[in-house]
Design a protein with these regions (language model features):
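Short, charged low-complexity linear segments at domain edges
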Residues: 1-11, 29-55, 168-174, 254-271
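Iron-sulfur cluster-binding cysteine motifs and their immediate structural context
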Residues: 2-3, 8, 26-48, 58, ...
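N-terminal basic/disordered segments at the start of proteins
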Residues: 11-29
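Secretory-pathway extracellular proteins and peptide precursors enriched for disulfide-bonded cysteines
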Residues: 12-13, 51, 56-58, 65, ...
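Catalytic cores of large soluble enzymes that bind and process phosphate-bearing ligands
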Residues: 19, 23, 61, 65, ...
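Glycine-/proline-rich flexible loop or hinge segments
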Residues: 44-59, 105-113
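Iron-sulfur-associated redox domains of electron-transfer enzymes in respiratory
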Residues: 78-379
Length: 379
């Protein structure tokens, strides 16, 4: 009996149209032919096949044996166990609620990065160090289209300190940062970092565990951004402007700290209750089980009591080596995670909530209701 070679047809039925697809675009950049593209209109954020003569699920290359799209997908079949085993040499236990790793707090020592970045500028400091010290050649990040006044997040490539500073701060509409990969590779980058939420952070591990070729080898570092959800672009006109009179072109900075915090160019500060934003949740986020980007090398989140510190989970030896080098060079300062027990408790709570999203019918998959455990901090 021939071995099964799952291809686009299976990916289309089991992930793309089942509600499990997060829109990460891993399948699109992995397609070698290429016959996959990406839909962003009307908040769709999903891959589609360009040649639909035989139907949207048909792929003549898949029928001939091409499996690259299913190798790249971080939500296809037994993805969690496969990636856990590849990255950590074991599957997680049921009480490892937010994945495998050590929790601490970190911030940049460069005050200009703290001021320009988000929650202490840690991610900016990390990317700048990696770019300037021959760790990576480029990073896949998100930026804002045009002059930034639309606040539409778009995939971009960062190759320098200036690029990192330009693309700092958070956006809360979706950007499939993996779509910037072709630009980075065509520009000669062989060692590429991916910065993204859990939906994207599992993609390199999926590709590597399933041997997806040069693409898998190039994605050498993953920095995760903790995320409960992102929002449809319509939130700007239909909520912020319609109810609060905040025009997107006037927004200077946004953050989420229990409420939607919005700073505007006229110097004013606004708070929008999160419950009012729930109706604008992006479709691809509704069944995502990964708040804590559990397959990143380093996961980061601004969920603590200290607004200028980042909650960090260091998950791999590569992540630890990078953290140690930055500390030795005086580029970051760290504190034990136990300094902010509320942040650690919130991390666990949000991780549990997100894991419960994964539908029971979609098996195998993430364990739905794990037990809470507190990890020792490295400092």
């Amino acid at each position: 009996m021939a071995l099964e070679k799952p291809q686009w047809k299976e990916l289309f039925s089991e992930v793309v149209t089942s509600g499990l697809c997060t829109g990460c675009a891993a399948c699109v950049i992995a397609c070698p032919h290429p016959v996959l593209d990406y839909e962003t209109d009307n908040g769709v954020y999903k891959p589609f096949h360009l040649d639909i003569d035989g139907g949207p699920e048909d792929c003549t290359h898949g029928q001939k044996g091409c499996t690259m799209c299913t190798r790249a997908c971080p939500r296809f079949r037994n993805w969690e166990s496969e990636i856990d085993t590849h990255k950590f040499a074991r599957e997680r236990t049921e009480d490892e609620v937010s994945g495998i790793g050590d929790v601490l707090l970190a911030r940049a020592t460069d005050e200009s990065l703290v001021e320009n970045g988000q929650d202490g500028g840690f991610v900016s400091a990390l990317l700048i160090y990696a770019l300037e010290n021959d760790v990576i050649d480029a990073a896949l990040v998100s930026g804002l289209e045009g002059d930034g006044s639309t606040w539409r997040a778009v995939p971009q490539v960062a190759r320098s300190r200036e690029d990192v500073i330009e693309t700092a701060k958070s956006r809360y509409t979706y950007s499939a940062n993996l779509l910037a990969y072709p630009e980075a590779a065509e520009g000669g980058a062989e060692r590429i970092a991916l910065v993204g939420m859990g939906c994207m952070a599992s993609a390199p591990g999926a590709m590597q565990s399933r041997k997806a070729g040069k693409l898998a080898r190039r994605l050498c570092l993953t920095i995760g951004l903790m995320c409960s959800k992102t929002f449809d672009d319509s939130i700007f006109e239909e909520l912020f402007e319609a109810k609060y009179g905040i025009k997107r072109a006037d927004i200077l900075k946004m953050n989420i700290k229990g409420v939607f915090q919005i700073w505007t160019t006229d110097g004013h500060f606004h708070e929008v209750p999160l419950k009012e934003a729930h109706a604008f949740t992006r479709e691809g986020c509704k069944q995502c089980p990964d708040f804590a980007d559990e397959h990143a090398d380093i996961s980061t989140g601004g969920i603590g009591a200290f607004g200028d510190w980042t909650l960090v989970i260091v998950r791999t030896d590569q992540g630890r080596e990078l953290m140690n080098a930055m500390k030795e060079n005086g580029l970051i300062e760290t504190r034990p995670g136990d300094d902010d027990p509320g942040a650690v408790a919130l991390l666990h709570r949000l991780a549990i909530v997100s894991r419960k999203r994964w539908p029971e019918a979609a098996v195998p998959g993430p364990r739905r209701i794990p037990v809470v455990i507190t990890y020792p901090s490295r400092h």
